[in-house]
Amino acid sequence: MLDIKRIRTETDAVEAALQRRGGAVDLNAFRALEGRKRTIQTEVEQLQSQRNTLSKEIGQRKAAREDASDLFEQMQRVGPRLKELESVLAELEGQVEAIIVALPNTPHSSVPDGLGEQDNVEVRRWSPSGGEGGDPQVLGFEAKNHWEIGEALGILDFEAGAAVAGSRFTVFKGVGARLSRALANYMLDLHTGSHGYQEILPPVLTNAECLFGTGQLPKFEEDLFRTRDDAYYMIPTAEVPVTNLVREQILEDSQLPMRMTAWTNCFRREAGSAGKDTRGLIRQHQFDKVELVQIRRPEESYAALEELTGHAEQVLKGLGLPFRTVVLCSGDMGFGASKTYDIEVWLPGQGKYREISSCSNTEDFQARRMKARFRREAKGKPELVHTLNGSGVAVGRALVAVLENYQQADGRVVVPEVLRPYMGGLEIIG
């Protein structure tokens, strides 16, 4: 949520910044409501002052045993009018808040302008054969898609997933299930052992307050799964419960920075994705992801974004998977982000890069919604923290990338070296 003081004092600048996102942002309704609020607030304050003065004078007359009936008549007129205006003021404040919570974050000055994916800017790429700046290696034979490989090896069963649950669900079998678990454990060990993250195992059910805090509600409710009889939602990402661990808290400066990682199931309705990625694991209603969350001091958050993005990239380097990193343009960023890097892994079967991680700095946007603060000194004034999050990385998409990049001409798949200790020493699948 944006700072209302900033919107009030820099309305034109905020409007211009939000228009960089490509939408038609018009803060005229905010301006009108604020103007009406100020007018009513002035009258409320005048009536409150009048009421206080009358109360004092009535008390004085009573003490002097003098008639105060005229003052009581005035008080009877002031009271109802004041109550009426206070009710109108509360309604206007609610309308202003509704406008503010619907506004996305403003893009950072370093974010390139643009309307969509085509305007994102590549900042680097890597491949195991070419290193930094290297292009993906050529397999030397016609690459298959991961669903062909997985079905042929008997490790991915899409028909069983559809029978058990419906479309966009998959059953992982045997070595496929073990490979998925191996990937997640490798990521967790890397992040906790080398990158300094604390492992968290959060609930996969959450409440509306937490989803509001991280920005999924109220705008994106249609993409969430909700329990029928209770006010619980299935988490769309571990970002929600993990970031909300600091909700309504005032942290001590010594507690920062906080780095947390979690491996969870994630659940998304994928509203608006009809016809997209209908085959395979790329777009599922249920999927596994290792999430990275950092809670930082404001002045550190952009350096932290580079760090967090590097941690996600390191997962792919360890797996020997070619990737590129792009900075999202202003029109392609998520609702709460001020700056985002997408990491896209190379998929030979599709002949293109696909997103496997999205790493964002939300600055104080989520913190303001969550009331998450810290003190620099023991008795210092609380300040909002900055929150960052990113996939470290999506487990299912990592499995897709392993199957497609490590496939052999005979249909077998080589197990990446870093995964072999998690696979009982298995070197090849098939």
Swiss-Prot record:
Gene Ontology CC annotations of this record: cytoplasm
Gene3D superfamilies listed in its UniProt record: Bira Bifunctional Protein, Domain 2, Serine-tRNA synthetase, tRNA binding domain
Gene Ontology MF terms in the entry: ATP binding; serine-tRNA ligase activity
Annotated pathway: Aminoacyl-tRNA biosynthesis; selenocysteinyl-tRNA(Sec) biosynthesis; L-seryl-tRNA(Sec) from L-serine and tRNA(Sec): step 1/1
Compartment list: Cytoplasm
Binding-site residues, ATP: 268-270, 355-358
CDD domains: SerRS_core
Keywords tagged on the record: Aminoacyl-tRNA synthetase, ATP-binding, Cytoplasm, Ligase, Nucleotide-binding, Protein biosynthesis
Catalysed reaction, written as an equation: tRNA(Ser) + L-serine + ATP = L-seryl-tRNA(Ser) + AMP + diphosphate + H(+); tRNA(Sec) + L-serine + ATP = L-seryl-tRNA(Sec) + AMP + diphosphate + H(+)
Residues holding L-serine: 237-239, 291, 391
Superkingdom, natural source: Bacteria
Keyword Nucleotide-binding: yes
Documented EC number(s): 6.1.1.11
Gene Ontology BP annotations: selenocysteine biosynthetic process; seryl-tRNA aminoacylation
Enzyme class: ligase
SUPFAM superfamilies xref list: Class II aaRS and biotin synthetases, tRNA-binding arm
Subunit and partners: Homodimer. The tRNA molecule binds across the dimer.
Function: Catalyzes the attachment of serine to tRNA(Ser). Is also able to aminoacylate tRNA(Sec) with serine, to form the misacylated tRNA L-seryl-tRNA(Sec), which will be further converted into selenocysteinyl-tRNA(Sec).
Domain commentary: Consists of two distinct domains, a catalytic core and a N-terminal extension that is involved in tRNA binding.
Family note: Belongs to the class-II aminoacyl-tRNA synthetase family. Type-1 seryl-tRNA synthetase subfamily.
HAMAP family associated with the record: Ser_tRNA_synth_type1
Protein name, per record: Serine--tRNA ligase
Originating species: Magnetococcus marinus (strain ATCC BAA-1437 / JCM 17883 / MC-1)
Lineage: Bacteria, Pseudomonadati, Pseudomonadota, Alphaproteobacteria, Magnetococcales
